[in-house]
Amino acid sequence: MDAFKLLTRSTNLKTGRAAATSAAQTSRLPSTGKAANPQLFHNSEADRLLEEKKKHGQKRKRGHGADDAGSEDEDAADLDFFSSAKRASTGGAVAGKRHQEQASADKDGDSGSEDGSEMDEVQRRTVLNAHKIKVTDLRDLDQIQSTNAQTLQTEEPKKKKKKKAKAQQEEPKTLTKKEQKKARRLFPQPLVSFKELRTKYKISRRLAENIAEQGFTVPTEVQLGTLPLQLGDSSVQQASKPGETVEPDLLVVAPTGSGKTLSFLIPVINKIVRHHHEQPDERGIFAVVVAPTKELASQIVNEGRKLVQGTGVKITLMKKGMQVVERDGDGDSDEKDVLDEDSADSGSDSEDDEQTTDKKTKGKAPVTKSDILVTTPLLLVNALSANRTKPLAALPLVRNIVLDEADVLLDPLFREQTLDIWRSCTHPELRASLWSATMGSNVEDLAKSTIQERKDLSGTTKSYPLIRLVVGLKDSAIPNIQHKLVYAATEQGKLLGLRQLLHPTARTATDVHLRPPFLIFTQTIPRAVALHSELLYDIPPEAGGSSRIAVLHSELSDSQRSEIMKGFRKGEIWILVTTDLLARGVDFRGINGVVNYDIPNSAAVYVHRVGRTGRAGREGGVAVTYYTKEDIPYVKSIANIIDVSEKLRGAGGEKSVQKWLLDSLPDLSKKDKKELKKHGVKARQSNLKSIKDNKEFRQAKISTKSGYERRMENKKKGAIAASRNRKSQPQAPSTGADSGDDSWSGLED
C-alpha cells in the first residue's frame, strides 16, 4: 500500500504525472469524436433565428390543426420523469400517437408546407452575415439589372409598371462601385436542418433517409448556403425568369473539412433520381465529378455510395481501360484486324479460330453503365480520345460537371485536360460547379470565359446565373486549429524538433503537444522516403514499432497506396509521411495534427495541408511548420495566413506569430513566388542530386549521420562497385610467355 496515497486521500494534491494526465483528458482532440456543432462561424442572434424557424416548422407539421398549447402539454408529459405510472403511460400513448401522425404525414409526401416560416430579407441577411457567407452574382451588371427590372414588373401593379418602365428606359443610371457590389449581392434562404431537404425542397425520400442514417443533422456553412441554391431556392429567383426554377452555375470557396462533398453530391443524386422517374428508358452518364488525385476520387465514390443506396443511382470510380463511350469505328477496325490475321494464317484450324474470337470479345471492354462518373483528368481524357489516337468523343447526356479542388484542376498542370472534359460535355443545359478552399481571380475569369464560350458555340439565348459563394475569408486557414511556426535553423534542427514531438521530455507552456495520428508533409518524394527511413525505429516495439509509420507518394502502385490509406484510416498506422499528394480533399476526421517538415510551395498549399486536421468543426488540432535559414525569404505568406486565422478565431491569448516577426520577414516578389510554386525551395529540389559536390544539397540532406560516416560508406560503396566492374570486364588475351610450349630453347645471345 502507498502510504502517501493513504495520507493524502482527503486532499486535492496531485502528482505531476496525474496532473498531466487529467489535463490531457480535459483537452479536446479531433480523434476523440465529432463536434457537437460542425459550424465554424455562428452567433447567438443567428442561432436564435434558425431555432425559431425550426420550431415554427415543427409546430405546423405536427399540429395538423391542433393548437400550440396542446403540443406543449404533450412535450411536458413526455419530459415528466417523476410522474405516476398512469400519467407516464398516458404520455407514452400521446407520444406514440404523435409519432404515428408524423409518420403518416411523411408518408403522404411531407405535405406540411414551410412557406409560412420563410425568413424575410433582413433575417436572411443576419443569418448569412453571422455565418460569414457571402453570395454574389457574377454576371454582367446589364443582365442583373434587366432581370431585376423584369421581377419588379411582375410584382408591381400595372399602372406603376408602365411609368417605371418608361423612367428606366429614359434615364439609365451609372452605378458606383459600392452600388455595383450591392446590386450583385444575393441573400438566399438558409437551410435550417437536413429535414428541410425533404419537407421544403422535396428531394427523394430514400435519399433523405440515407442522409439521416449517416447522422447529418446540423448543416455546415457551405451546406447551409449552397444546397438551397442548387435545389431551387425561390428567394433568389430574380436571377432568372419569374416563376421558373433555375439551377445556377456555382463557384464555391469554403474552408477545408466543411462538407463540400456532401454539398455537391446531394443535388446531383436527387436530379438523377428525378430524371429516372421522368425518362426511365434513357440511361447513361448524367454527371461527371473530376478530382486531381486518385485518393480524393476514391473518397468521393465511397461517400456517394452511402447516399445512393436504394435510389437506383450508380456511382463509379474511373479506372484504366474503362469504356465510357461507344465509338462506331472501334468495332469495324477490330473486325478488320481479325480478318487480316485470318487471311495471313489461312492454314489455322478451328481451335485457333475460337481463340481469335475469344480475344476479340475480351479485348474490348463493355461501356460503363453508371450515372455518376468520378475520375481524374488524364484517365477520362485518355478514355474519350482512345489514348490520344482519335478525336475527343462527346458525352451528350452529362447535365452536371463538378470540379473538386478546381484551382488545381485549372492550373497549368491539369488545365488542358480539364477543359477537354468540360468541352466534351455537349448537353445544352449543362451546369458546372467549381469547389475549393482556395480560388484565385484567374480561376473565376477562366470559368466565366469557358461558360460564355460554350454558350456562344451552342447558340442558346437562355442565360443561367453564375453565382459565387464564399464562406469566411478567401484563401484563409480554418480558425479552429492551433498554428505553430517554429524556427529550426538547419535540417538537423528540424529532425531534432520532430523527434521531440514524438518523444516529449518535459511539459512547458511554450512546448507543442501533438499526439498521433498525424501527417508529415515534405517537398519531394526522395525527402519523404529519407525521412521515413530516418524515423522508422523511433517508435518503440511495445507500441508497434516500425509498422506504425509509413510513407505515401505517387511512385507507389495503386494497390500499395490503397493499402496504406486503409491502414491509416483503421488506426494501424499512426504517422504518415507524404508529399502534397494528400494535401487536398482527403478526409481524415481523426487526425490530431499536421507537421510541415518542409514549408509549402505557396500560401494555398499551406491552407490545404493544415486543413487535414480540424475537420467538421473538431477542436484541438495542431499545425506545426518548421523553417530553416534557407526558408526565411519564403515564410511571410505563411505567417500572414496564421495571423489572419487567429484574428478570425477571435480568441485571446498569446499569438503564434508576433508583430515584430511579421515586420521583419522579407516580402517575396511575384517572380520568386512563381518560381517557388513551380519548383519549391531550391536547396531541396530533387535535381540537385546530380551535382555531387553541391553544398546546398549536402546541407539539406535528411540524415543524422556525421560527414565522416557518410564518407566511409561512400568509399565502401565505391570499392564494391569497382570490384564488380573488374569482375565483369573480359580477361586480356594470353601473351607468348604463356603459350604452353614448355621446351627450353637455351640462352639467347
UniProtKB/Swiss-Prot annotation:
Subunit details: Interacts with the U3 snoRNA and is associated with the 90S and 40S pre-ribosomes.
Biased composition (Low complexity): 17-28
UniProt biased composition (Acidic residues): 69-78, 111-120, 331-355
Compositional bias segments (type: Basic and acidic residues): 44-54, 98-110, 167-178, 690-699, 707-716
InterPro entries for this protein: DDX52/Rok1_DEADc (IPR044764), DEAD/DEAH_box_helicase_dom (IPR011545), DEAD_box_RNA_helicase (IPR050079), Helicase_ATP-bd (IPR014001), Helicase_C-like (IPR001650), P-loop_NTPase (IPR027417)
Binding site for ATP: 254-261
Name this polypeptide is given: ATP-dependent RNA helicase rok1
GO biological-process terms attached to the record: maturation of SSU-rRNA
Domains: entry comment: The Q motif is unique to and characteristic of the DEAD box family of RNA helicases and controls ATP binding and hydrolysis.
Species in which this protein is naturally found: Aspergillus terreus (strain NIH 2624 / FGSC A1156)
Domain of life, source organism: Eukaryota
Cellular component aspect of the GO annotation: cytosol; nucleolus
Region of interest: Disordered: 1-121, 148-182, 324-366, 672-749
Domain Helicase C-terminal: 497-665
GO molecular function: ATP binding; ATP hydrolysis activity; RNA binding; RNA helicase activity
Free-text function comment from the UniProt entry: ATP-dependent RNA helicase involved in 40S ribosomal subunit biogenesis. Required for the processing and cleavage of 35S pre-rRNA at sites A0, A1, and A2, leading to mature 18S rRNA.
Annotated family: Belongs to the DEAD box helicase family. DDX52/ROK1 subfamily.
CDD domains named among the record's database cross-references: DEADc_DDX52 (cd17957), SF2_C_DEAD (cd18787)
Catalyzed chemical reaction(s): ATP + H2O = ADP + phosphate + H(+)
UniProt keyword list: ATP-binding, Helicase, Hydrolase, Nucleotide-binding, Nucleus, Ribosome biogenesis, RNA-binding, rRNA processing
Domain Helicase ATP-binding: 241-457
Disulfide partners: none
UniProt motif Q motif: location: 192-224
Subcellular location: Nucleus, Nucleolus
Annotated EC: 3.6.4.13
UniProt motif DEAD box: location: 404-407
Compositional bias ranges of the Polar residues kind: 728-737
